[in-house]
Amino acid sequence: TAAATLDGPVVFYWHGTTNAPAQAEYALGRAQIDAILAQGGVVIAPEHDPAAGILPWFLADGVRDDDLRVADELLACAAMRVGVDARRIHSVGLSAGGFHTSVMSLRRASYLASVVSYSGGLTATMAPTSDAPGARFAALVLHGGADDKVFPYVLQTTSERYVDFIKVRGHFPVLCDHGQGHDIPAAVRASAWRFLQDHPYGATPSPYATGLPAGFHPSCALVP
């Protein structure tokens, strides 16, 4: 396999409430997963611990770092077993997984190059600190508009809060309102993967700083 000879990207996928790791295939897209594997990369879609509560990840509604420590261990295992490109470690999450990815982007800024949050962001009680204050990452932040709600959360609001939170701290967000509610439209998945590829670790300034590339999903825009 390509992983045996190439040190490729690592993409974590954190699923939403009532979902499972297999959701990664829909969320990332089969074509994108095949591209990751062809580059010698790995998709890591963890199982959640039922002890996390109603939401599947501890950091989606709390402060315990169990899932971060699992991510650290899985990443170390991938590096040892197949080899990884340390500049191309990414996280993607939907809903509760989007909350987790948003918090993880700061709590693991030491190794995350770029992230994609679908209907995630930060709630009013979240203010994560960076484990690498000098590091800068890029985030593609997507929500489904005013109808993107899962009680008690309005995901447009949480997504915008995350964008504001990271931008003022020097990170690079791109915000997308795809207008299709609490979902991942199939048409955005290629742009999400392109975003991750175009933002390896330390890509500052972003190659998108002066504008999004041609063909990028039209719901997305730079944050002024």
Residue ranges and their predicted role:
Residues E25-D34, L74, S102, G120-G134, ...:
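Alpha-helical scaffolding within the catalytic cores
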Residues L6-R87:
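Serine-hydrolase catalytic machinery in alpha/beta-hydrolase-like enzymes
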Residues P9, G41, A113, F137-A138:
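Alpha/beta-hydrolase fold active-site loops
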Residues T17, H48, G145-D148, G179-G181:
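Acidic beta-to-alpha connecting loop that harbors the catalytic carboxylate
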Residues N19, A79-R81, A86-R136:
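Primarily recognizes the serine-hydrolase "nucleophile elbow" in alpha/beta-hydrolase
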Residues A2-V10, G134-R136:
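Proline/glycine-enriched tight loop/beta-turn segments at coil->beta junctions
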Residues A139-L142, V154-P224:
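C-terminal catalytic histidine-bearing segment of alpha/beta-hydrolase fold enzymes
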